[in-house]
C-alpha cells in the first residue's frame, strides 16, 4: 500500500473487508531522490526550464504530508490485516523475501513460484539503472529524515522484521 493510497478514497479495507494490505517500506531519502528524478524527466519534455530545487521543495512537502495522512489512516486498519514489508524483502533479497511475504499474507509459496522468480527479477540486458542524487534537487538527507521522522520510526520496526 502506498501511503497516498486512500487519501482521497475510502480505505481499501472498507471496500474489501477481508483484505490483507501490504505496506512496503523504503528509505525516504532514496525515495525522494528517485521521485524527484522521475518528476524532472517528466518535466524535461516541456519547453520550459526545469526548476530542480523547486521540484525538491514541492515534492518533499507533498510527499511528507501524504505520508502523515497515510500514517493517520493506518490507525484504522486492523493490525491483523496489515503486513509491513521492508523494501529489502523484494529489492535486495527476493529469494528469501518473496516467500516471507507470501507467508505473511497467508498465501502459499510453491515450487512453481520459486522457479519463476529468477526471470521475474532479472534485469533485461542493455538496460541502465536509474541513478539519482538528492542534492541535485536542493535537498539534504537531514531535511528528508526530519520531514519523515514519524514514518522512519515505523520503518525502523519494519526493517527489523
Predicted segments, located by residue:
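PAPS-dependent sulfotransferase catalytic domain
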Residues: 1-24, 69-72, 76-77
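PAPS-dependent sulfotransferases, especially Golgi type II membrane carbohydrate sulfotransferases
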Residues: 15, 32-161
Amino acid at each position: 500500500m502506498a501511503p497516498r493510497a486512500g487519501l482521497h478514497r475510502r480505505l481499501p479495507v472498507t471496500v474489501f473487508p477481508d483484505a490483507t494490505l501490504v505496506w512496503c517500506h523504503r528509505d525516504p531519502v532514496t525515495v525522494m531522490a528517485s521521485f524527484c528524478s522521475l518528476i524532472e524527466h517528466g518535466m524535461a519534455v516541456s519547453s520550459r526550464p526545469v526548476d530542480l530545487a523547486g521540484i525538491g521543495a514541492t515534492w518533499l512537502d507533498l510527499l511528507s504530508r501524504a505520508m502523515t495522512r497515510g500514517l493517520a489512516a493506518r490507525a484504522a486498519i486492523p493490525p491483523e490485516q496489515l503486513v509491513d514489508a521492508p523494501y529489502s524483502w523484494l529489492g535486495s533479497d527476493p529469494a528469501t523475501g518473496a516467500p516471507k511475504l507470501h507467508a505473511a499474507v497467508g498465501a502459499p509459496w510453491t515450487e512453481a513460484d520459486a522457479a519463476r522468480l529468477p526471470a521475474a527479477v532479472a534485469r533485461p540486458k542493455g538496460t541502465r539503472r536509474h541513478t539519482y542524487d538528492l542534492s541535485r534537487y536542493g535537498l539534504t538527507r537531514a531535511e528528508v529524515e526530519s520531514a519523515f521522522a514519524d514514518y522512519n520510526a515505523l520503518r525502523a520496526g519494519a526493517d527489523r522484521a
